[in-house]
Amino acid sequence: GFNVIDNYTYCFLGDGCLMEGISHEVCSLAGTWKLNKLIVIYDDNGISIDGKVINWFSDNTRERFESYGWNVIGPVDGHDIDEMDRAIATAKQSQDKPTLIIARTVIGKGSPNRQGTSKVHGEALGEEELKLTREALGWKWDPFVIPQEIYDAMNAREKGEKLEAEYNEMWARYGQEYPQLCKELSRRLKGDLPEDFEAVMQQAIEKAAVAQETVATRKASQKALNAFASHLPELLGGSADLTGSNLTNWTGVEAMRPDTYLGRHINYGVREFGMSAIQNGIALYHGFVPFSATFLTFSDYSRNAIRMAALMKQRSIFVFTHDSIGLGEDGPTHQSVEHIPSLRLIPNLNVWRPCDTVEALVAWQSAIESRHTPSIIIGSRQNIEFIARDPQEVVRDAKEALKAGAYVMKESGKGADGVDCVLIATGSEVPLAVKAREALEEKGIGTRVVSMPCTELFDKLSSEEKRAILTDAPKVAIEASVTGLWYKYVKNGEVVGIDKFGESAPAGVLWEKFGFTVDRVVEAAMKAINH
């Protein structure tokens, strides 16, 4: 056979890492999945920044990992290269378990006055201690000088070149014997999309533009998945125990299980942070387009992983549903108000809040095509009315949304040159903006409605392009979230939003209570106009 992908994955961690909650989430899951090619080396030095960890970390690490279903080796001497080499060789023999190698070490080993203390953890040794350390280690060479014998012993270039040549020769033979498989694997490892992907998405958008269905945008997201997932074999999704609510599964998809890794949907269990971090690892490995899902309010648990995806410029896709007070009786613990604007503050992250199936398709297309920018796709629990208009107009709007993150959904009754007011909305508030426009038009106020599903793409436009969409007319932004960020778009205009936590009540009652009504939007528009 051709072992074109046969690597082990190595992870190095310390005492502090094992104190973090995420270590339980992911290590428990790795044991359940029987990931035998995962080898974790634990630097067990007993020291963290505050001192000896025995005062705040007294777990029996061996028993902990054995309870997860891991193979545990050690403790071994982490300073003994031969002993470590034997431990790794033993770990590679595991057939059905990941392996933890407990490597006992002395932090700062060789420093006469600081080894084994927290001082060497977060501080430089200093010139005097460096001098003493060199003497203790018998190191006679100047700083930054590597003796030739050590350089030669550590230089793996010749060995690496030989192994790479052997691998390239095997890859060439693989390509000759299995040309289609080789071509497909090469495409996926490069991160390129299938040649027909754009056409598939365009066809799905055109179909949705005709159907004009009124659905919850979590359902719209699932419809998008059903449209393209079979054409994107590298798509690998999952949910943190909310598959039936997030709607991350698609027709015909199989779940990944410990007895088969062929499934393309992962049941992560209630592990939001672990799920999001695993997804980043999958993205870094290449060959897959990973996405994960939970409720929007639980994005707080995933925030560090989201930030890291943005920092590392990875194509990670995060689906967050149940996005506002619109979810109703679950109350303020589950009703997001601050999450959307706070996620928009993360650099190099596209946050999509679509209002219908067409915008959901656009959001997915953008997320999948954004190779170096992670994306968030936000969905509602409740149905959102599709704003009826000519299908060709809808398709045109979709192209504009994909490029600009915003578009004119409804023009002023006085035409583009007669805009007296602009209503900007996202997601479930777009139909409210359209209804408010009708009321304003009856008052003789030419009102344009702009749907802005992705503010980040809009922010990248030139001043002229932004003005073409928003004009210089007074503006009102409408979104069921904290209002602050919207003032950069409305300037001295108005924002209809929520600057306090929600309450437990039916969604209809909450919309009325928090001022998401036509009368409130009209009032805000009149105030903006009369500033």
Regions found by a protein language model. Name each.
Residues G14, V76, S239, A293-T294, ...:
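Small/polar loops that bind or transfer phosphate-bearing groups
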